[in-house]
Amino acid sequence: MLRGRSNNESVPYLRLMKYPGAKFSIIPVIEEIFRASECDTFVDAFGGSGSVLLNIPSKIPVYNDINSDLVTVFSAIKHHTFEFKSALTRKVFDILNSSGKEVNPKRGPVSKRDVNAIEKAVNYVVSFSTSFGGMGRTYSTGKEKAYKAYLKRTLEIYDKISKNISSWTIHNMDFRELIPKFDKTGTFFFFDPPYPGKTWYDYDFMETDFADLAKHIKTLKGKYLLTLNSEDETLFDIFGNPTFIRSYENENGKKRPDSKKYRYKAFYTNVKR
């Protein structure tokens, strides 16, 4: 994953862990709209893996997710930077030295063996990064080398990641509480709600949730960008016609012959471009 620079060089995107629905392909669009908004505050309402805030600079970055496990991860990195790195290093080295045995159990409720929030956070990051497709619900074996290289890369860029996260304000709120708290002139909201019908997330969105989000968006004082899969046409009845649609090469399509070559993202915004 590469990001552009003004001198036409490219550098890798910062990425803490594998996670479903990461936004690397649309980060250039998000950054374009955010810059055009001229806002100081960037609120990622459905922050997930943090891929957006990690790669789009803002004066006041705000991370939010309703998943308390994700919030624990970023809070641990922000407030216990070196302790988290030490625990992650030990965990990764244990995995790198494993010899073909299962190294990561299926993700579920945090075990009682996790004696503190740092261990819980490290185990959560590792469980996603060593699972198939970043889904966190299956496990990898020592025969698979890709996730080991991924974890090594995570350690290599950890200092850059933690420095970025140190400036974040981190919240664990429902979007209905979050929006009124931060809505004002100068605030930019990025909304990327869970995809309908997917089982990737611990907290799925119902049609009533989308309807509530649409109501909040209509009364925003600040600026926003909302992204949806354009194939979810039922959502068009809720949000109306998108401001624009973009096509992206389907990475999964390269591996599965039955997949579509391109996927289409619908974007909604009140930012003039």
PLM ranges: what are they?
Residues 53-58, 180-184, 233-241:
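Short loop/helix-cap segments at secondary-structure boundaries that form the rim of catalytic
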Residues 38-42, 59-60, 165-169, 219-224:
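Short active-site oxyanion
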Residues 32, 40-105:
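SAM cofactor-binding core of SAM-dependent methyltransferases
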Residues 206-273:
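Long, positively charged, glycine-interspersed low-complexity recognition regions
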